[in-house]
Amino acid sequence: MLVKVFSFFILMITMVVIGVSKEYCDDKHSCQNFLLELKTASSSLSEIRRRDLLIIVLKNSVRKIDMAMIGVMEDTKQHEEMENDKLCLKEDTNLFEEMMESAKDRMIRSVEELLGGEFPYLGSYENIHTWLSGVLTSYITCIDEIGDGAYKRRVEPQLQDLISKAKVALALFISISPRDNTELNSVVPNSPSWLSHVDKKDLYLNAEALKKIADVVVAKDGTGKYNTVNAAIAAAPQHSHKRFIIYIKTGIYDEIVAIENTKPNLTLIGDGQDSTIITGNLSASNVRRTFYTATFASNGKGFIGVDMCFRNTVGPAKGPAVALRVSGDMSVIYRCRVEGYQDALYPHIDRQFYRECFITGTVDFICGNAAAVFQFCQIVARQPNMGQSNFITAQSRETKDDKSGFSIQNCNITASSDLDTATVKTYLGRPWRIFSTVAVLQSFIGDLVDPAGWTPWEGETGLSTLHYREYQNRGPGAVTSRRVKWSGFKVMKDPKQATEFTVAKLLDGETWLKESRIPYKSGL
């Protein structure tokens, strides 16, 4: 009986996958095998049935992850003594496990949301779209970061298979149309408990008031409960639905901080971006994997960082060195300073909002595959290593179905005092992956930016599939007459087109940003 039921489900999956099979099977044998296993038949199923099939695909992928992790773990134990570089092996193993858990968590959440009463209304729909994009990004992060060697040869077949399944799941999801329900979409959940001691009439976050009700205080001088940021984060509860507030007093905190995904809803408030400083000096030259070079990494959903500095002191000569990596959905960075050189800010995954921040770096200094909006930020290019150019963005959208992209709105793009603009070229961005998506809207662009505006990553790759957009910018670097002539680049004239890159559209921000009490501009 069970065999018949399973065969029936497989048949249903084959009926729905026909519409997405060719596009995602041309390049990977694993995807071909997957779709061959499903045996395409018909695509005339209702959207409810498509939802049911997507749930089956996701549950199957969760089981595949569990099997892959067990298999890789056993294989690694057998070959551990043969590995020459134990540090690399440890980093690769940790990264593989972390990204598999990341993907698994997002798929489980997606299944729960698919079964919820609000799908496919917009808020629920955008949640799932974000998380399924994050599943794909998690797998690709593994492929990108794990070093070439025996370990990669062991895990790559499983990763390629999972990547193919993630692309199919995304395409299947996109085949379901969202429903617009203004009432559902505009409802903001009840004010979180952390606002119960603050005047809820305050439209915007009151940092001084929140400091007084902080759950814990960190201070270098001993006036707080803890003297390190890590100790305070360790004290935060796991899997909490209530916000946990950590007030970090003035001081330089020389420590590498990582918030696990089991600790959502953390708020860290400092005394100002020039007063509360978290600093580190890891780089690809000593940690090997860019992902783990971050001075501060947040993996928890709903993270809010306010009035502090995230700094990586490694200079421009040592390659990628992240100051801040954000890998949690619905994260907000407000009035913070992000300071580094190559890969300084890594908006890795999911929805993120940056407001009134100071961001400085050199090569690809805003990089990743998040859906991120930057509003009223100071984006400052600094002097790179000799012979290098500056690239402000390196966005890594993998497929047209991804829910990701960077939007730079009402920001100032300028040069630091040490940047020699006469000899160093600076570009708005280059495509890390072929569907790289970046929009610069209503911003000031200084004369540091090359007239071409944008530059290729390698040859002609991605120049017709990327989405680079500019809209109503000003300043000497905003002149578009000499911009690149790629088919993927456009100067937008229609505000309806530009609206796609706003908080409301790119982040679905109206459904979650109000809770943060951080000021934001929803549209243009």
From Swiss-Prot:
PROSITE patterns: PECTINESTERASE_1. Residues 215-510 are annotated as: Pectinesterase 42. Disulfide bonds join C357-C377. The keyword Disulfide bond applies. One of its GO terms (cellular component) is extracellular region. Its EC number is 3.1.1.11. It comes from the Eukaryota. Substrate binds at T290, R430, W432. Acts in the modification of cell walls via demethylesterification of cell wall pectin. This is Probable pectinesterase/pectinesterase inhibitor 42. The lineage of its organism: Eukaryota, Viridiplantae, Streptophyta, Embryophyta, Tracheophyta. The gene is PME42.
